[in-house]
Amino acid sequence: VLRRGAPLADRLTARMVELYGLPQPLRLDLQVKRYADDLTLLHPETLLTEQAQHAALDLRGSTVLVVDDVLYTGHSLLRVVEYLARKQPAAIRVACLVDRVTTRLPVHADVVGARLGIAPPDIIECHVPPYEPDFRIELVQPARPQ
């Protein structure tokens, strides 16, 4: 999932190829948007943008690994899983760097870097190269009224 999911997928892929000698997998980038980085709702329905070259992609029999930075309410992940399911893969697995443990929909991550049960207004910022200079996870607490 673009944006920060893509470099995470690259890191994960490189490690799997190195450790297990797997062939380089096909990469399918999906642009998904529902929330801004500050958790402001941008779109009432999750928007998914498909790259034209992937429209006719046949995933039958494949295992697909979806990689994203933060699992929040599950709306974006559900939209991605619905899209991929129409391409009939054998299995869809999900990896995320941070699970906020606040999903509202019947989706989950199979592989999670960190589960952080935090207050709803708090924000998880994932710093992922090349978008940021260093790799880290930060908890941002907006100013609360006194």
What is each model feature region?
Residues 1-146:
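PRPP-associated nucleotide enzymes
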